[in-house]
Structures are given as structure tokens and as C-alpha cells.
Amino acid sequence: ILGMLVAEYLYKKYPKYGKHAPVVTLVPFRDDLSCARGDIPRAWFGSPLRGAFEGVDMLDNEWVSPNVLRIFPKRKFAEDAPLGSTYRLLHYYYGKSGIKMEANRHLTLENIDILSCRGHAIYVTGEQQFWQYINVNVRPPANDPLRAVSSTADHHHVANSKGFMKLLGCAFTMGNDDCGNFHDNSYFGKRGGDPCVLLPANLRGIGLFSPKPGEELELFQDDYSPANWRGKIVKIDGEKIFLDKPLPEQKGEGFVCFKTRYGTRNIIVRDCDFVRHTARGLLILAKDVTIENCRFGYEQHGSIKFETGYTKRQWCEGYGVDNAVVRGCVFRMCNISGRASQGFVRDIMLAAYMKTDPSDEQPACPIIKNVLFENNKFYDLHGLVATISGSENVVFRNNEIHAGGECGGDLWYKGGFAVIGGKNIFIVDNAFFGDVPFAGVIEKKGAVENLNASGNRKISE
């Protein structure tokens, strides 16, 4: 389901030669496939609205010979991609997925290897509750350059659940998107002419939210301040959601809508490896989360994001973050591509997104609360350890930050922290080893209440 065309022509005859060969993504990799590259352009040929599903054509192409495929991307990509570079070419993005689970309870998956699949390797939705993975691995066969990808989308994706999940001793690698995405689908809607009708304020409409009669909704204003309203769905008519009571006053462009029957929470991730993959390590849009003794490395866009948000074009995800701990983990060479947000390249990110993803705008009421990072080790940073905004009660303590490595870049703030907005933020008792360029904390004036940066120290190696 995938291919690599490189200067050495690994294929004498490509398996799809003479057949239709859709091209969805081109991701630059090191020649030895040890990790993605961030110094040359990548390309995604999907549509934000049509997606990148199986059977959707993305890019015109034609066969030149049994092992040469000519593609017709936009001119800029063709001009900027260096000759002789190694790219991982994928024919699919979303697809059938490897293992799909919906509304199971008390389920264990153990000693499973998913070598490759179209779409998410593992996909969870519905009222799934009380389940665990023990030694479940998403990784292609070792030492086979022709098997250059595991999952063509996320390694593990939770679209909705009722929580209580364990991920123990697992390894996720070489997929084409996030290692783990834990959230519940939300919805961005607005008042219609009828006060009991909710209309879409997002171009994707109700599809991913999948509302059903009888479900109860809880509404928030578009800055995540409470609307103090709950009501039930009476019926669905096209894109219209009919409710059992009038909607409250709409103070902005719409309402962020949660389904009360879902709540992805109580997650334990322990002794796992998240390495050598596209996109991010873990996206946590959940409550009551423990991430312990895990290893993150050689990641394209950063290791962990605590977030919740909505956009006006694409996705609306998460019911907020509360009570999360990241302890005893090792982070090495994360955010290879130098992905920046809110003006800084970073590894860890805590932020909401509103209307666009990412966004500088942050909620009036912090939606990310009570997060602790302690006793972790960071090596070979591209930029900051973390950016923090839209958050309340966040602590980074007793962590080690080490200089040096090959991640690249000479950013003046490498190794430090940026607090862009929030309340009760503590960066305390951390150790900066070696010649860390910036052993400090950046604070956005007027946007932070009660920042404590104390007890941090530099140690010569």
C-alpha cells in the first residue's frame, strides 16, 4: 500500500506499475529511514473538506517506466524539493483501519503486531469503556526498506469513548500521523431562525459529530465560557439539529457543543515507545491522564500536546484537559521539522485552539487545567521545552534539560519555556545541563497571572 522511489531504484518493478496509483502524501525521510526530515518540504495533496479517504484522487500522475512515477504537484513543491532526496510516498491516508472498536467494555488486546494498514492502525469510537493494550505494537517489519510505513494515518485514534483505558508496554513507530490521539468529537454550531434549532458554524457540518435524537448536549460560548445550558436532541433534519428547549444567548460566532454521554478520561500510558513517525507523539484532549516512563523520539512535530479546540473549517475536538501527569519520560530529538506556534518552536505544547488550529487567540476560561510534568529528561531540543497558554495550574518541576545533539537550529531560546497566557504556572527546580542556550522562562506581559520560576539551576556537564 506504499512505495518509495529513490535514486537507487529499490524497485525493479513497482507493484502498482500499470495500475492507478493515487498519491496522497510525500514526506521527506533520511535515506536510512531513521526519521523524517524537517529541512526540506513535504506535501499533502488532500482536500481539507473532502479529506483523504480511500478512493479519493489527490494528484495527477503517470507511469514513465516500471519503477518511475511522474507526479504533477504544484510548481512550488516541484521547485523546492531537492533532487536526490528520499521521500516516503503514500497512496492512502484514511482508510479501513486495522482494528476498529466501537462500544466495547472490559476488553484486553495483548501481544499484537500491526505491521501496516490503510488508515488508523487502531480506531475507537462509541461508548467504549474499560479496555487495555498490553504489548500491542504498530511497526513495520524490521530491516525491510520496502516496508516504509506502518499506519497511513494515526497509530491509535479515539474519536469518542467513556474512558478508562490503559496502554502498557506498547511501541508505535513509522506511522504517517500522530501516535495517539485521545479525544471526543465536539461540534461548532450556531443559532438558526428557530430558537430551538442549531445550525453548523463549521464547513464540515454535523458529519463527525454524528448527533442522534435523545442525546443530551452541553453548550459553551465560542470562548469556552459556560453557556449554562443543557438540552436534548429531538430530531435531525439534514444539517439542522432540533432541540427540546430554546438555545441560550449566543455571545460570539457560535457554540461549542459537547455530548454528555461521552468523556474520554482515566487514561494510563506506561512504558511505551513513540518514535520515528510523522506528526506528533500524543495528543491529549482528555481528563485524568497519567503518562509514565515512556520514550519519545525522532518525531516530526513534537512529542505531547495538551489541547482542546474547534475550527471553522475542519475539526472540533476535545472536552478539555484536567488532572494530567507526565512523569519519568525521556524526550529526544522531538519536533525535527521545527514546527512553531504562537511564535516559538517547541516540543511540548499546552494550548487551546479557536477558529483556526493553531491559534493565538485563547479562551477566556482556561480549558486546560492541573497538568504536572516531573522527573523527565529532555535531549536535543529544536527550540523550547514547552509553550503554555490557555492553561491554569501547570507545573514543570525536577526535569532535566540537556544541551547538544543534532536536531538543528540555533534559536536563542532553545532549552527554555514560554508562558504566553494562563494562571498559576510553576517552572521550578529544573536542571539545565551543559551549554543550554536559554535556561529561563519567557513571559508574555499582561497575559499571565501568578508565574513562579524559581529553584532552576545550570549544571556543567
Model-inferred region functions:
Residues 1-116, 124-125, 140-149, 173-265:
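Extracellular polysaccharide-degrading/modifying enzymes targeting complex plant/algal/animal polysaccharides
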Residues 1-12, 93-104, 119-127, 155-161, ...:
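Extracellular beta-strand-rich solenoid/capping regions of secreted or surface-exposed proteins
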Residues 126-173, 178, 311-327:
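Extended hydrophobic/aromatic segments used for targeting, binding, or gating
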Residues 1-10, 130-141, 153, 182, ...:
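Extracellular beta-helix/beta-solenoid repeat scaffolds
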Residues 100, 108, 113, 123-124, ...:
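Extracellular beta-strand solenoid repeats
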Residues 418-461:
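Leucine-rich solenoid repeat scaffolds
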Residues 96-98, 118-124, 141-154, 163, ...:
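Short glycine/acidic-rich loop motifs that flank beta-strands on beta-rich extracellular proteins
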